């Protein structure tokens, strides 16, 4: 159709203005450009972002725009960007437009879905709350995840967000036999590469679909990759009735790329230079991550916190949507305790006796009280020393130090760094161990025996070995 052809009238970095003779493409419609750069044939996908008046549109490029010139031919697709869905996407890596980028045989999809879809309606959504066991002690005990809930992993650079995500993918594949979708939103290419090979080595690759829009790509690709991954997860939920795990690393980059796109489209920025539509854009993505009567999408989103400032508009806009927060703390990482989850800052909506049962709730709040008391006593200890404390406070400090150590755990995906085999700890074992510490059952065991182990049984074995050596 000649009418659906247009031409480039302006190229502004990743933004391209296109004019059509008699056709006006809809917002979110895909446009295709086939061109040649230095004798190499290239194709580029654009997505319509704004109507400029007349038959002119402003579109965001999903790849680099080098080599584009004015008056070049552009073809409208008449539909949105569509990506492959179904079991054939498992074990493969895709870019934002659904092309496989893992150097394997190109995928010829039998089914594709558009990346912009409506969120499930109120009637379709499920209101049932169930705990999702992760096998990670500190999470299951103090900030449990709910099936079909949204979890934020908060932390600055280099405190271990990606390692926790990899461990969760591992545990879901091995223990729950479930599918996962991983969306790499504006993160390091090296990390994406490492993740792929580690999953291949760990034998979990056939249970996960990977979608990457990395740091070096234009903002359009970094922003829309979250929708590409989500669409693949929605298929497993809606058509197959499965419980899927959706990982987004990093949701901050989704907001950041939205800010870049907004500025390029000429919108006036709001606080801290973010886009004026930040809350709406975040809601559009988050509302699609939901549990329906068919299946669920449980999502874990790593949230980079710029300069460790939780009041920054980007992390603040994510907070509103979360059911649980897992906050990583650099001070805990500096003590050598991994995962460096802050037991007092991390929260969960389901940490209540009605949702998780009286026993779990009592142990969790008991642990938090001991840790809080220890935190309050630290100023006194720093000034006067441990000897000035009452006998009861000394006991609290001893138990708190054991709890801190026992909250550490060797991960399967970190075996290569730590040399310790990974451990999956069931909720039952976790409650037994921490309940015993609170009751004073293990007051006679040295605190070093609690460090980097799985269940309390291992603590007792380690203490026995320490005594004998």
Swiss-Prot record:
Q: Which PANTHER family match?
A: ATP SYNTHASE (PTHR15184), ATP SYNTHASE SUBUNIT BETA, MITOCHONDRIAL (PTHR15184:SF71)
**Which CDD domains does UniProt cross-reference here?**
ATP-synt_F1_beta_C, ATP-synt_F1_beta_N, F1-ATPase_beta_CD
Designated name of the protein: ATP synthase subunit beta
The record's listing under Pfam families reads: ATP-synt_ab, ATP-synt_ab_N, ATP-synt_VA_C
Entry's localization field: Cell inner membrane
Cross-referenced HAMAP family, in alphabetical order? Answer: ATP_synth_beta_bact
Instruction: Give the protein's function.
Output: Produces ATP from ADP in the presence of a proton gradient across the membrane. The catalytic sites are hosted primarily by the beta subunits.
Q: Known Gene3D superfamilies for this protein?
A: 2.40.10.170, Bovine Mitochondrial F1-atpase, Atp Synthase Beta Chain, Chain D, domain 3, P-loop containing nucleotide triphosphate hydrolases
Membrane topology term reads: Peripheral membrane protein
Lineage of producing organism: Bacteria, Pseudomonadati, Campylobacterota, Epsilonproteobacteria, Campylobacterales
Name the gene. Answer: atpD
UniProt xrefs under SMART domains: AAA
EC class (word): translocase
NCBIfam families the record matches: atpD
Keyword check for ATP-binding, yes or no. yes
Q: Which organism is it from?
A: Helicobacter pylori (strain G27)
The entry's ATP-binding residues are 155-162
Catalytic activity as recorded in UniProt: ATP + H2O + 4 H(+)(in) = ADP + phosphate + 5 H(+)(out)
Q: What family does this belong to? A: Belongs to the ATPase alpha/beta chains family.
């Amino acid at each position: 159709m000649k009418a659906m052809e247009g031409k480039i009238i302006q190229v502004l970095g990743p933004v391209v203005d296109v004019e059509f003779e008699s056709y006006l493409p809809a917002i979110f419609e895909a446009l295709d450009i086939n061109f040649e750069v230095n004798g190499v044939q290239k194709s580029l996908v654009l997505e319509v972002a704004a109507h400029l008046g007349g038959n002119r549109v402003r579109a965001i490029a999903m790849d680099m725009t080098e080599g584009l010139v004015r008056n070049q031919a552009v073809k409208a697709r008449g539909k949105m960007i569509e990506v492959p869905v179904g079991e054939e996407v498992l074990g493969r890596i895709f870019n934002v437009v659904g092309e496989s980028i893992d150097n394997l045989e190109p995928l010829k999809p039998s089914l594709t879905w558009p990346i912009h879809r409506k969120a499930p309606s109120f009637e379709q959504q499920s209101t049932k709350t169930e705990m999702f066991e992760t096998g990670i002690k500190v999470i299951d005990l103090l900030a449990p995840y709910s099936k079909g809930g949204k979890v934020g992993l908060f932390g600055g650079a280099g405190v271990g967000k990606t390692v926790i995500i990899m461990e969760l993918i591992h545990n879901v594949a091995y223990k729950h036999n479930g599918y996962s979708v991983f969306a790499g939103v504006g993160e390091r290419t090296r990390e994406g590469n490492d993740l792929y090979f580690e999953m291949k080595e760990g034998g979990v690759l056939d249970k996960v679909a990977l979608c990457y829009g990395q740091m070096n790509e234009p903002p359009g690709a970094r922003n829309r990759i979250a929708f590409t991954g989500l669409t693949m997860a929605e298929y497993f939920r809606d058509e197959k009735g499965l419980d899927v795990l959706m990982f987004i690393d990093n949701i901050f980059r989704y907001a950041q790329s939205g800010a870049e796109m907004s500025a390029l489209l000429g919108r006036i920025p709001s606080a801290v230079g973010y886009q004026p539509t930040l809350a709406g854009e975040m809601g559009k993505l988050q509302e699609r991550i939901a549990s329906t009567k068919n299946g669920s999408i449980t999502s874990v989103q790593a949230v980079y916190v710029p300069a460790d400032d939780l009041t920054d508009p980007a992390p603040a806009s994510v907070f509103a949507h979360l059911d649980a927060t897992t906050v990583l703390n650099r001070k805990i990482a500096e003590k050598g305790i991994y995962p460096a989850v802050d037991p007092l800052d991390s929260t969960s909506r389901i940490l209540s006796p009605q949702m998780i049962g009286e026993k779990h709730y009592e142990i969790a709040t008991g642990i938090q009280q001991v840790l809080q008391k220890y935190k309050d006593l630290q100023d006194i200890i720093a000034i006067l020393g441990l000897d000035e404390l009452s006998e009861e406070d000394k006991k609290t400090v001893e138990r708190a130090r054991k709890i801190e150590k026992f909250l550490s755990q060797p991960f399967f995906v970190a075996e290569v760094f730590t040399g310790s085999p990974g451990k999956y700890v069931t909720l039952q074992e976790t409650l037994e161990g921490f309940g015993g510490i609170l009751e004073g059952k293990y007051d006679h065991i040295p605190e070093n025996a609690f460090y980097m182990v799985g269940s309390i049984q291992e603590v007792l074995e380690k203490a026995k070995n320490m005594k004998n050596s």
